[in-house]
Amino acid sequence: MLKVLAIETSCDETSVSVVSNSNDIYKIHSNIVASQIEDHSKWGGVVPELAARKHLELIPFVLEEALEESKISIEEIDAIASTVTPGLVGCLRVGSITARSLCTLYSKPFLGIHHLEGHLSSILFSKNYPKPPFLTLLVSGGHTELIKIGERRIMQRLGRSYDDAAGEAFDKVGRLLGLSYPGGPAIAEIAKKGNSLKFNLPKCKISDKKGGFLKYDFSFSGLKTAVLRLVEKIRLNGDEIPIPDIAASFERVVSEVLVERTIKCAVDYDLDNVVVVGGVAANDTLRKMMISEAGKKSIKVHLAPLNLCTDNAAMIGAAALFRLKFKAHESSLELGISGRLPIDQANTLYANKPPF
């Protein structure tokens, strides 16, 4: 049984987890997540410097709690992993330095993990997770991407957002409507009271230089602006803003765009399994719509467990365990951190010469 200690500090969650893999059965022994939502809510979003300082404060306690809850000592751990890209640089540095220091102290192999690969790997904790090739919709606060997963974790990005990610749009529209941070859960809750067909909001597309539109790419900035203009118009008329109806209409359109382009991509590439991961994957409207529409095309949908949709270290550990299956995937202790790295370059994190 392979056991990994994993650390996630890419944004505003300080998380440490102990996970294992035995005969392709992935198990979580502990997954401690210390959220900073209350620290950032008064600002309406994550403040990078504040987040990094909070990680420094919390990491010793979260690490101790994760090991204690797992009942696995650090000496019994086979490898240590941390998120090294993408994310907020100051935040990434806290987790990376902690992990590499532990590796040096206890003579353990180090694996630097791509944050998005962590999200992709959250599905490994589900029963009957699909075998490649399959299509993954990764939809979170910072990323909206369609990724084809091949054998040995070869990844091909087929679609992406050109401006705001879906989760970012939820946060900005939530702030516009005067809702609490983060916007995703707040919009989902108040949308239950609204009429999702009340407002006809736009489904924005990205123009293709060759003509027409990019079939699998996303744009949510225009949708966000459309909500702003709608609110301004209602205010000018002196009417009360129907927040539940706007929230429900916005949630519906975002879900429709994600579902329509995901299924189109899966059909075009002849992929009969779709995986949905990331923070926005917790949205109930999106989950139900994806299952319903995919079923019409005989496509099976695999949803990340609700408790693993948002940032956590267990998913980072799962990515590390998957990499360890192929023996050669170990990172140099000289590997640094980077705010950006395309998902299809994740394999470079295990090269003899680190990419950063």
From Swiss-Prot:
Segments crossing the lipid bilayer: none
GO cellular component: cytoplasm
Record: residues binding Fe cation: H115, H119, D311
Keyword flag Ion transport: no
Cofactor(s) required for function per UniProt: Fe(2+)
Reaction it catalyzes: L-threonylcarbamoyladenylate + adenosine(37) in tRNA = N(6)-L-threonylcarbamoyladenosine(37) in tRNA + AMP + H(+)
Record note on cofactor: Binds 1 Fe(2+) ion per subunit.
NCBIfam families linked: gcp_kae1 (TIGR00329), T6A_TsaD_YgjD (TIGR03723)
UniProt name for this protein: tRNA N6-adenosine threonylcarbamoyltransferase
Source organism: Prochlorococcus marinus (strain MIT 9515)
